Curated annotation (Swiss-Prot):
Subunit and interaction comment: Homodimer.
Catalytic activity of the protein: cytidine + H2O + H(+) = uridine + NH4(+); 2'-deoxycytidine + H2O + H(+) = 2'-deoxyuridine + NH4(+)
Protein's gene: cdd
The protein, known as: Cytidine deaminase
Family annotation (Gene3D superfamilies): Cytidine Deaminase, domain 2 (3.40.140.10)
Physiological role: This enzyme scavenges exogenous and endogenous cytidine and 2'-deoxycytidine for UMP synthesis.
Keyword set includes Nucleotide-binding: no
Cofactors required: Zn(2+)
Gene Ontology MF terms: cytidine deaminase activity; identical protein binding; zinc ion binding
Origin organism lineage: Bacteria, Pseudomonadati, Pseudomonadota, Gammaproteobacteria, Alteromonadales
Gene Ontology terms describing biological process: cytidine deamination
Length: 296
């Protein structure tokens, strides 16, 4: 079991903890498939809802909040039945808008893993307005069931009435819907090819600034992030922040980063290079490779 879970595992009921410990192997980064969730439910003799709430301390252990020191964990349950943990991330000494909220982390985890719809969000603190707006961008976002400790579950529409969303800006294919933009780039570099794939899967209906970031660590592992825009603009999630959240979930240190690539569309109304460099240079003393690509 990874050291970061030693304290949080003690907060779980013993039967649940005993069943979970073998799953917290060295490569665990917050994903449990539907069968594993069923195993935990059976072994603990708890309901699925009780298990998900009980797992929140494990999700919170993925957090990296050097500014607030407030650890928030969230779990996104996909339509597949799999669950995806996420946690808040803050960049030391940097402006607060670079922060990643736990719900954003969990949702981006699910999206990067191929999920196409979130049905439940479980979180240990009431979602802030920023996260409510972020969730509202998702497929059937208003129907997502929000679960909080010691409270009744409610759909997102309960927390965000009279919501402003994609449909108000004539966007009919929301975040996580199956869609891909094709780009042309001739490269044999595996890291650039990976970034190209993720840029094509990014979500930028308001600016057409499709983009992705790939981070490589010294051992050759890669961690990606995609751009995820929002109808309210400010809650948009930048690809560098998503990539850093991905890296931290995998229990890697910022000092492990050896290479960083931003790939973005030449036809976008904005560029993410400035914000991406700011975030990168806060955590790693390396240069950003910036590649601009043409849509097919």
């Amino acid at each position: 079991m990874q050291d970061r879970f030693i304290r949080s595992i003690t907060q779980l009921p013993t039967p649940l903890a005993d069943a979970l410990i073998p799953m917290l192997h060295q490569n665990f980064a917050g994903h449990l498939d539907a069968q594993q969730l069923a195993t935990l439910t059976s072994a603990s003799k708890m309901t699925e809802a009780e298990v998900l709430l009980a797992l929140l301390p494990i999700a919170a252990a993925l957090a990296k909040p050097p500014i607030s020191e407030f650890y928030v964990g969230a779990i996104a349950k996909g339509k597949s039945g799999d669950i995806y943990m996420g946690a808040n991330l803050e960049l030391p000494g940097e402006a607060l808008f670079h922060s990643v909220h736990a719900e954003q982390s969990a949702i981006s985890h699910a999206w990067l893993s191929g999920e196409s719809q979130i049905v439940d969000i479980i979180v240990n603190a009431s979602p802030c307005g920023h996260c409510r707006q972020f969730m509202n961008e998702l497929v059937e976002g208003s129907k997502i069931s929000i679960h909080l400790p010691a409270q009744e579950s409610h759909p997102l529409a309960y927390y965000l009435p009279y919501a402003f969303g994609p449909k108000d800006l004539n966007v009919t294919s929301p975040l996580m819907a199956k869609q891909q933009t094709e780009f042309a780039l001739d490269s044999a570099d595996p890291m650039i090819i990976e970034g190209l794939d993720h840029a094509g899967l990014s979500y930028a209906p308001y600016t057409q600034s499709f983009a992705a970031v790939v981070l490589e660590t010294r051992d050759g592992a890669t961690y990606c992030g995609r751009y995820a825009e929002n109808a309210a603009f400010n809650p948009s999630m930048l690809p560098m922040q998503m990539a850093l959240s991905n890296l931290v979930r995998h229990n890697r240190e910022f000092s492990d980063i050896s290479r960083a690539v931003l790939i973005e569309s030449s036809q976008g109304k904005i560029s993410l290079v400035g914000a991406t460099m700011d975030a990168l240079h806060t955590v790693a003393a390396i240069e950003l490779e910036h590649i601009v690509i043409d849509p097919v």
